[in-house]
């Protein structure tokens, strides 16, 4: 896939023992889940090549929202709350979680950023039920790959980053 120089591409991965969700994020500076692209829900044991292909597609779908009106609409608080609630409801129904606590308890999150032919995969610290941060994560925990890495290498890199998640 071709990625533009000096353009940021974003994705986030959410993982539980029951699923792996590859999600496109868009924005400008601040990013958010892009409602134009449905989460790619995979089995946690998906092969690295397929996983890498889904990550590359999610990154390719990422949009830079450089028009102010577009950003204002994209980050509308009420719409964002509705979309987040729908995301939770979908995951709970599809995977049989009875409570949000059960859904989020063992969930890991990894952020992926691609810019200027470099993919940076950042593990996170699970702060509280629905919150992750970079606290307790060192830059040495990041997985950094060239953008022309094979899908298998990217999938493997994600698994390495997941193993470095904390909390």
Swiss-Prot record:
UniProt name for this protein: Immunity protein CdiI-o11
Record SUPFAM superfamilies: NMB0488-like (SSF160207)
Subunit: Interacts with the C-terminal fragment (CT, residues 88-377) of cognate toxin protein CdiA-o11-EC869. Probably recognizes only the toxic DNase subdomain of CdiA-o11-EC869 (approximately residues 222-377).
Superkingdom of origin organism: Bacteria
Function: Immunity protein component of a toxin-immunity protein module, which functions as a cellular contact-dependent growth inhibition (CDI) system. CDI modules allow bacteria to communicate with and inhibit the growth of closely related neighboring bacteria in a contact-dependent fashion. Neutralizes the toxic activity of cognate toxin CdiA-o11-EC869 (the C-terminal 289 residue CT fragment). Does not inhibit toxic activity of CdiA from other toxin-immunity modules or strains of E.coli.
